[in-house]
């Protein structure tokens, strides 16, 4: 495949969805609209809006949101004129009924997310999204937990259900640059040339931007990123950093770097009640290959039971826990307590 540095990259912002994890899903309507206005002014292509765990994620298991998904989506729809509104749906958490409500509220893109080996459960949701006329994306989470070849097979399933773009999703921030390269080559070898691909990176090993650059070199079309890296764990690829790097590389990203830089520092960073950065705990996520949104839950359990957050995270990684198993964090903490 010949890399085309002149093609327009699709910039997909996730500050208002993945970024929700960083503040325990407590964005106010005022916060959401201020961030959306800045992103729209900077000309990003899409803005993802939802609870951190997707439509209907607000729950005891994942954490209750300050507002409903529909309230957030409607608030963003009021202020954007350029960017399209995206949302996230995890089969088993959100249903096709919730997807229809999100569409009616203003969402026009949906990313249907499954564990990297469970694409089968996305069939109904992808098909229904296509019926609604939505830009329908398959989102293969925790992509480090299977081989490039197996990931490609799962990507092909999502394509066969109707997804027109498939994402390699590094939910644990555990992929190396070579890992990303191998996965994109395998996936693109199996998908139709007309099917787009996307990268969703996390920064737990400080490779979020580097991995996104490698993905683009391998033909990736859509890049997820967030202002100030606002996201689960050590955050996502920081949007303003990726755009600055893309600018230096001469790539066509279509966004305004300075508007993004200002929004990151003046609007988003002040909202963080825990710094979104690589530190002892978030590094443990990437090192152990643990779902990034486990961080805040593990910190609560560690404080409650007098344990080390790192020990809890490493044990979760050893047990190969995946997204949706947040309830196991307390189980692991109690097991560690018993051993100590």
From Swiss-Prot:
Give the source's domain of life in one word: Bacteria
**Where are the catalytic residues?**
21 (proton acceptor)
Q: Which UniProt keywords apply?
A: Aromatic hydrocarbons catabolism, Lyase, Manganese, Metal-binding
Q: Where is this site: Transition state stabilizer?
A: 17
Binding positions for Mn(2+)?
18, 200, 202
Q: Name one GO molecular function term.
A: 4-hydroxy-2-oxovalerate aldolase activity
Q: NCBIfam families, per this entry?
A: 4OH_2_O_val_ald (TIGR03217), PRK08195.1 (NF006049)
Name this protein carries in UniProt: 4-hydroxy-2-oxovalerate aldolase 4
In its UniProt entry, the species of origin is given as: Azotobacter vinelandii (strain DJ / ATCC BAA-1303)
């Amino acid at each position: 495949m010949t890399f085309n540095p002149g093609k327009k990259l699709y910039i997909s912002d996730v500050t208002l969805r993945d970024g929700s994890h960083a503040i325990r899903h407590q964005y106010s309507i005022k916060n959401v609209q201020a961030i959306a206005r800045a992103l729209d002014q900077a000309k990003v292509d899409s803005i993802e809006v939802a609870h951190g765990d997707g439509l209907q994620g607000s729950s005891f298991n994942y954490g209750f949101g300050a507002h409903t998904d529909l309230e957030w989506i409607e608030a963003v729809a009021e202020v954007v004129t350029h960017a399209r509104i995206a949302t996230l749906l995890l089969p088993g958490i959100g249903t096709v009924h919730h997807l229809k409500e999100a569409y009616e509220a203003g969402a026009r893109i949906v990313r249907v997310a499954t564990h990297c080996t469970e694409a089968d459960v996305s069939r109904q949701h992808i098909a229904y999204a296509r019926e609604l006329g939505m830009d329908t994306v398959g989102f293969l989470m925790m992509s480090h937990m299977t081989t490039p070849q197996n990931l490609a097979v799962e990507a092909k399933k999502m394509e066969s259900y109707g997804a027109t773009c498939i994402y390699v999703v590094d939910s644990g921030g555990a992929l190396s640059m070579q890992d990303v390269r191998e996965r994109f080559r395998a996936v693109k070898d199996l998908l139709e040339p007309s099917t787009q691909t996307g990268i969703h990176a996390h920064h737990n090993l400080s490779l979020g931007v580097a991995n996104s650059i490698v993905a683009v070199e391998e033909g990736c079309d859509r890049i997820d990123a967030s202002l100030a890296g606002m996201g689960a764990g050590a955050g996502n690829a920081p949007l303003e950093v990726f755009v600055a790097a893309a600018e230096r590389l001469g790539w066509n990203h279509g966004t305004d770097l300075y508007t993004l830089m200002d929004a990151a520092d003046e609007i988003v960073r002040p909202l963080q009640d825990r710094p979104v950065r690589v530190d002892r705990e978030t590094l443990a996520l990437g090192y152990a290959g643990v779902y990034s949104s486990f961080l805040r839950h593990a910190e609560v359990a560690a404080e409650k039971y007098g344990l080390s957050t790192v020990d809890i995270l490493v044990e979760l990684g050893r047990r190969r826990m995946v997204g949706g198993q947040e309830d196991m964090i307390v189980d692991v903490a109690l097991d560690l307590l018993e051993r100590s």
